[in-house]
Amino acid sequence: EEGLDFPEYDGVDRVVNVNAKNYKNVFKKYEVLALLYHEPPXXDKASQRQFDMEEL
């Protein structure tokens, strides 16, 4: 049965902070790039902890 051939996870996370200076190098280095935008967490510790848990 034919279908889509999805790549398997190889166990290596490739998370990069993309900014105005390094985005061209990131485009050259990786075949696929997904950008996730989010607001920065508030300054209090509870908000920071919630943000960290959601990112995991």
From Swiss-Prot:
The modification Phosphoserine is found at residue 47. InterPro entries: Calsequestrin, Calsequestrin_CS. Belongs to the calsequestrin family. GO terms for cellular component: endoplasmic reticulum; mitochondrial matrix; sarcoplasmic reticulum lumen; sarcoplasmic reticulum membrane. This is Calsequestrin-1. N-glycosylated. It is a peripheral membrane protein. The modification Phosphotyrosine is found at residue 9. Calsequestrin is a high-capacity, moderate affinity, calcium-binding protein and thus acts as an internal calcium store in muscle. Calcium ions are bound by clusters of acidic residues at the protein surface, often at the interface between subunits. Can bind around 80 Ca(2+) ions. Regulates the release of lumenal Ca(2+) via the calcium release channel RYR1; this plays an important role in triggering muscle contraction. Negatively regulates store-operated Ca(2+) entry (SOCE) activity. The keyword Metal-binding applies. GO terms for molecular function: calcium ion binding; identical protein binding. The lineage of its organism: Eukaryota, Metazoa, Chordata, Craniata, Vertebrata. It comes from Canis lupus familiaris (Dog). Keywords: Calcium, Endoplasmic reticulum, Membrane, Metal-binding, Mitochondrion, Muscle protein, Phosphoprotein, Sarcoplasmic reticulum. GO terms for biological process: positive regulation of release of sequestered calcium ion into cytosol; positive regulation of store-operated calcium channel activity; regulation of store-operated calcium entry. It is found in: Endoplasmic reticulum; Sarcoplasmic reticulum; Sarcoplasmic reticulum lumen; Sarcoplasmic reticulum membrane. Its main location: endoplasmic reticulum. Monomer; increases in response to a depletion of intracellular calcium. Homodimer. Homotetramer and homopolymer. Can form linear homooligomers. Ca(2+) ions promote oligomerization. Interacts (via C-terminal end and preferentially with the monomeric form) with STIM1; this interaction increases in response to a depletion of intracellular calcium, decreases both STIM1 aggregation and clustering, interaction of STIM1 with ORAI1 and store-operated Ca(2+) entry (SOCE) activity. Interacts with ASPH and TRDN.
